[in-house]
Amino acid sequence: MKSAMRNNSLLLISNLSLALMVSFAALASGAGATDTKSNGGMFAARDAGARGDGTNDDTVAIQAALDAAGQAGGVVSLAPGRYLVKASLRIPPGVTLQGVHDAPNWSAPLKGSVILATAGRDAEEGPALFEMGDSSQVRALTVYYPDQRPKDIRPYPWTFHLRGFDNTVEDVTLINSYNAIRIGPEPNVRHRIRNVYGCALRRGVLVDTCSDIGRIDNVHFHCHWWSVPEVGGEWAPVHEYMWKNCEAFIFGRTDWEYVNNTFVFPANIGYRFIHTAAGEANGHFSGIGADEAQICVKVESIQRMGLLISNGQFVAMRGEHPRQVVIDKSCSASVRLVNCAFWGPAEQNVVAHGGRFLSLSDCYFSSGYSAKTSGPPLVEADAGRLQVRGCSFDAAGPGIALRKGLRHAIISENNGLRGVEIVNEIGTNAIISLNEPAEPAPAPGR
């Protein structure tokens, strides 16, 4: 059904645009005043009939320009304007769709090259707004769904769908995408997602079936991108929807994923690692952040070599049991966190019910409990093997709980607000040394 819907939509656009595409391609190949060589591979969407007035449907004209550029590869430029797009656009292999605004666009969201997307309301499984082929690129534009409402948020298909080799989404602002960027599930390699800012309501980036080093850099999801009155925004309902529903970064099968300088506020789950029909993820995650989340990082299933997470900042404060890192029983691989900070009113910082190895090094742990109120252990594990070294525990009560089921632990060189209180239920299977001794709990009322 999903494939038929996508194919029917793309066939309709192709048929509607045939005459315009032929005439525009003839101009580009030499039948008119210019040709592909003399214009340097640049194609203007307005030369193909796009108006950019926000009223007339520009879908057919933009697709005609894209198809003309696809004959030999090239760039389709979108001059400043508001381009109403009522169906899916196919970006052919070797083609770039390029607007004029490289910077994030918050205070004046409808300036520059803006796509007004209206297709797919209540049809989440339909074709994406941009269906991207091998070595295609979309950059320097803004996407806005004018029919979406903050108090009546409805499902829409993905804004971007990447498949194949070497796709790029860069310098893009998303005002109110329901589902933002999907990579796969078709086989793909070496995606590049760079400098994407905006509001992703339900899902931000989903990666799957990537067999060779994808890269995600400088991606920032925040509810305030859909708070400006000019685009019908409203902080409170958008904020609430995101912390209840948004999964910002989801990783299925991806080999050697590189993720740097990414952030979400707020979220149901900031970073989620799942099993799909294609497999699981491994990779390097540096400078990542999740704020006002229910769970910042949720590890359900990963490849055996696992995850390397460094310089992360995690704040959990929503839901019944806010926690920063949760490793499920279904995980049987390695998770390593270095130089990360955990703060805010979280109930716990790291909870591990699975995993082959878990390593926490040079991290700062704290919770919303006051210095005089003892809460649950900040770090708790009941499976796999655990190492905690060189960390600081800035809260009252137990810092670490080694529960029955944990096979082995090394706890060393840690300090804390009142020393480091360690609950040890695994006896001699724990090596505990060189930690600041725990102080007695203060008397009631003191």
Language-model segments: residues:
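The right-handed parallel beta-helix/beta-solenoid scaffold, focusing on the short coil/turn
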Residues: 41, 74, 81, 87, ...
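Extracellular beta-strand/beta-solenoid scaffold signature
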Residues: 111-130, 150-161, 176-183, 199-211, ...
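Bacterial N-terminal signal peptides that target proteins for export
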Residues: 3-17
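Leucine-rich solenoid repeat scaffolds
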Residues: 400-445
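Bacterial N-terminal signal peptides
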Residues: 14-26
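Extracellular beta-strand-rich solenoid/capping regions of secreted or surface-exposed proteins
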Residues: 63-71, 83-98, 104-140, 144-166, ...
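Feature marks extracellular polysaccharide-active and adherence modules
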Residues: 79, 86, 92, 98-100, ...
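Acidic Gly/Asp/Thr-rich repetitive segments characteristic of extracellular carbohydrate-active
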Residues: 45-79
